[in-house]
Structures are given as C-alpha cells and as structure tokens.
C-alpha cells in the first residue's frame, strides 16, 4: 500500500491511562472535532474526562485499534454517555472477535466488560477517517489480533501513528492469545517500519511513546520484519 504523506492540518493529543492493566486511551483533536481511540475501561468516566479535556468539541468517532477487551471495554459506556449518533469503528476482522475477547478477559483475569454495540463502520486497509482538518489512514497490522490496525496521520504538526498493541518499545505485542501470530506481527512491524516516516511519533496501547526511527535502530523484531517486507 501507499500512504498520503502530504502533511496538513493540526492534531493535538490527550492520553488517559486507565484500567487495571493501564491501557492508553487517546483523544485526538483537530479543529472543532475529536476522535476517541481505544476507550478501554469505564466508558462513562472516560466521557467525563473527555468533556473536561476537550470542552466544546464534537465527537466524530470512536475507533478501536483491535478487538481485545482492554481496548473495547469502554465503548458501550461512552456511547451511552455521548449518544448513539457517535459512530463506532473497528476493523472488519476484529469485529468478529469482540465477544470472545471479552470472555477470555473474564476467564483469565476476572475482569468483566460490556460488549460494544455493533460497529457503524468496518475498517480495512487503505480506508481513511477524516475529521477536523486531518485524516487517519488505516494500515492493516495483523499478528496481535487478526484485524489489528495502525492509524497514521500526516499532520502539519507532525506525523503520528496510533499503533495499539502491535508495537512496543524494542518489542511487539503478545501473540499467544486467540488469533495471534508471531510471523504476522513481525511482518507487520516490518511493514510500518517501511511505510511510516522515521519521525513518526508512535502512540502505544500500554507504555510510553516511541518513534519509527528509534525502533528501526533498536527493535530487532522490526528489523527482521523489514527484511521480509522488502
């Protein structure tokens, strides 16, 4: 695939780390709109934080980078708080695993989550989500889950990628859950290493931020995947 690297518009980002396994939820703000990415836990409370952090902004969408319970668990609560007219977006492949993922979380750790409503839009590679004066470009990155995605934004304020649990500093997300694949996730790391500009700020599902440049230097999994991708 090819990405539009024409940098345009401004993007401001608020991160809220929430829940017992410290998931990062992001509020991506552009002009008078905001997109919520990975509302993990306690959706009603997240909606209150959103109103405090982003007053007066219209919520353009709720997007999940993948279908695991610790990234979709707050969707239902946020929709109740914000209104059913706020669209919920997730990849087509991961829309099919949400229910099983919630059951797995309950069995493994005893955490209970509410199943999100049916998605209003199913995302596939190459799709674009426009809001404010920027665009989020969808890159398919299977491996952590069958339908994991990265959301890339070439904004005038800087290149940003919401990478979910595909990439961690010097590592990658776990692949031992249902639908995970070590080969696929390494290939996905190589893919984003090849496609995304080196200065891209990578906003991660759990942990601190990193950049593509830093990972190309230090992440052996990305370097291995890059050889396969090219």
Annotate each predicted stretch with a short phrase.
Residues 34, 42, 104-105, 111, ...:
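Metallo-beta-lactamase
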Residues 23, 70, 96, 169, ...:
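Active-site loop signature of alpha/beta-hydrolase-fold enzymes
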Residues 11, 57, 85-87, 134, ...:
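A structural micro-motif
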Residues 16-18, 118-120, 140-142:
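Short Gly/Pro-enriched turn/cap motifs at secondary-structure boundaries
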Residues 42-130, 159, 217-227:
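Active-site HxH/HxHxD metal-binding segment of metal-dependent hydrolases
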Residues 39, 66, 92-93, 165-166, ...:
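Short secondary-structure boundary segments
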Residues 24-26, 121, 126-127, 149:
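Residue-level detector of beta-strand structural context in well-folded domains
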